[in-house]
């Protein structure tokens, strides 16, 4: 598997010269199957922090610009620094694209509602309903196990304020 770190900061983005080496965006990691030769090799995205905006710009140079892209977004938890990039994610507004969104089930509200509320007036000028891509939300238990194509995903609860889970990804003998 190949990883690309689009955002590694916590709590809030910190742009500037002091963060140039590792970047100033919040949590977003792209995981690709090593050679993408498997016909079902998925594009995986871990968390939707501000790094998601830059990833989205790059994705719009591929099939996502034509509305034929598919990706899987695994969200560890819905604190602001892990979801604040979603309203700025260009592929989300391209009809035909498909996004499967996975996160820990919450007791207080549905996952789709959490994402919609951050784009609600007066917080953001574009409502979540303007997203033209096809979105599928899957709410997970702490110990969920499932496959995304040839990638096995295992979840475990984290010791973190509120509700958070970690994802272990296994593909052809490699693990992340």
Where are these regions (language model features)?
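Binuclear metal-dependent hydrolase catalytic cores
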Residues: 1-176
């Amino acid at each position: 598997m190949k990883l690309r770190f689009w955002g590694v900061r916590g709590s809030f983005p910190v742009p500037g010269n002091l963060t140039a080496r590792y970047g100033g965006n919040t949590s977003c990691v792209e995981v690709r199957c090593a050679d993408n030769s498997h016909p079902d090799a998925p594009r995986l995205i871990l968390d939707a922090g501000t790094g998601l905006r830059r990833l989205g710009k790059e994705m719009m140079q591929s099939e996502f610009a034509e509305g034929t892209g598919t990706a899987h977004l695994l969200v560890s938890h819905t604190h602001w620094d892990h979801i604040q990039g979603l309203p700025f994610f260009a592929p989300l507004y391209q009809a035909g694209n498909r996004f499967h969104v996975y996160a820990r089930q919450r007791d207080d509200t549905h996952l789709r509602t959490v994402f919609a509320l951050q784009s609600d007036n007066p917080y953001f000028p574009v409502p979540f309903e303007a997203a033209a891509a096809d979105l599928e939300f899957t709410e997970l238990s702490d110990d969920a196990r499932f496959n995304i194509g040839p990638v096995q995903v295992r979840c475990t609860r984290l010791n973190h304020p509120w509700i958070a889970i970690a994802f272990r990804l296994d593909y052809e003998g490699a693990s992340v």
